[in-house]
């Protein structure tokens, strides 16, 4: 009975987007659902509108039907399932800081990025702490995860490659796993993409002639290239080892691209923060609106308020609606 009640709560939060003229077409965006959160900042686990976030900013897959959320001002990592159930994995708003150990007592300072592996490891880009953290499943540990620092110098910003725990970052904003177990992060204060591999940090792009302005998020494309949302240049950049930076979407099409994701068909999705929309970009560069209304922030059925991240997972396009303190989604393939 309780499960059915909670499912109805999540389904009842579905909200239909208004018809919006999309760039390159006239079709209305698909329906957008509010999965969890109510538009009010706070900290609470629960189901649907009972849950509270305070600036949810990044997303990652978490099992077959849920996502992880980095919740900035709650200094925590949360999970959200498709039925709207929210629980805290690690951190808490009253535990800002840097402390490793069991997830139940670990401390984070404004976690911005989160990335997961199939075997359950969770990487966290801690923007204010200037570190990369790792959560590993461990039986008998309070909270179920052990938290360790894998790169960076806690509380100290800078730009230094080398041994991981001696390296320095300046506000890492995302965490993306490579096939070889490396962790990639856009280091926005240094305008570079950094990598942690085998205990060593190096800069893979952004230095020399490969200049970026404000690399905010990264994702893997189907052809193995890394796509970078450069919010400062209003561009999507692409990178492959041994090649110079490329450009995927022409300048003028985007307005502060803050998050990027790739669908199974190769479609790119962008959380275009300043335009208040989520966009889809196909292989030919055609741009369409998936959610939101251009230039209009709001919290009603048709609007977003500074969309920060997107993720394709479990048949949905998930959206971190930053200033509405909620997680939304669009069902794909309809």
What do the PLM-derived regions correspond to, one by one?
Residues 29-55, 85-110, 143-171, 200-216, ...:
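Gly/Pro-rich loop segments of beta-rich domains
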Residues 75-78, 85, 130-134, 146, ...:
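A short loop-to-beta-strand structural motif that recurs across blades of beta-propeller domains
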Residues 61-64, 116-119, 177-180, 220-223, ...:
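Residue-level detector of Asp-centered blade-edge/turn motifs that repeat once per structural unit
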Residues 72, 127, 137, 188, ...:
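Short loop/turn segments immediately following the C-termini of beta-strands
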Residues 15-30:
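Bacterial Sec-dependent signal peptides at the C-terminal "C-region" and cleavage site
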Residues 66-68, 121-123, 182-184, 225-227, ...:
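Conserved beta-propeller blade signature
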């Amino acid at each position: 009975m309780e499960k059915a009640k909670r499912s109805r709560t999540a389904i009842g939060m579905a909200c239909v987007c208004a018809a919006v003229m999309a760039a390159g077409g006239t079709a209305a965006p698909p329906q957008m659902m509010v999965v969890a959160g109510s538009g009010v900042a706070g900290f609470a686990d629960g189901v649907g509108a009972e849950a509270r976030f305070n600036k949810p900013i990044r997303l990652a897959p978490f099992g077959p039907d849920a996502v992880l959320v980095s919740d900035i001002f709650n200094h925590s990592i949360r999970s959200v399932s498709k039925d709207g159930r929210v629980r805290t994995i690690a951190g808490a708003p009253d535990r800002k800081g840097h402390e490793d150990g069991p997830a139940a007592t670990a401390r984070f300072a404004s976690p911005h990025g989160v990335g997961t592996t199939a075997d359950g490891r969770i990487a966290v880009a801690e923007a204010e702490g200037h570190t990369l953290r790792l959560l590993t499943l461990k039986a008998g540990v309070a909270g179920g995860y052990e938290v360790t620092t894998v790169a960076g110098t806690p509380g100290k910003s800078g730009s230094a490659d080398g041994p991981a725990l001696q390296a320095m970052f300046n506000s890492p904003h995302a965490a993306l796993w490579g096939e070889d177990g490396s962790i990639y992060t856009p280091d926005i204060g240094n305008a570079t993409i950094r990598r942690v591999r085998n205990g060593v940090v190096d800069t893979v792009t952004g230095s020399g002639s490969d200049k970026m302005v404000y690399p905010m998020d990264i994702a893997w494309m189907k052809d193995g290239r890394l796509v970078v949302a450069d919010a400062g240049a209003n561009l999507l950049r692409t990178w492959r080892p041994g090649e110079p930076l490329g450009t995927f979407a022409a300048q003028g099409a985007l307005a502060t691209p803050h998050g990027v994701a790739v669908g199974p068909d190769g479609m790119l999705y962008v959380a275009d923060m300043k335009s208040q929309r989520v966009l889809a970009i196909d292989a030919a560069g055609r741009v369409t609106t998936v959610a939101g209304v251009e230039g209009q922030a709001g919290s009603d059925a048709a609007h977003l308020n500074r969309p920060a991240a997107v993720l394709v997972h479990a048949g949905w396009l998930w959206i971190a609606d930053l200033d509405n303190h909620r997680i939304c989604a669009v069902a794909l393939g309809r």
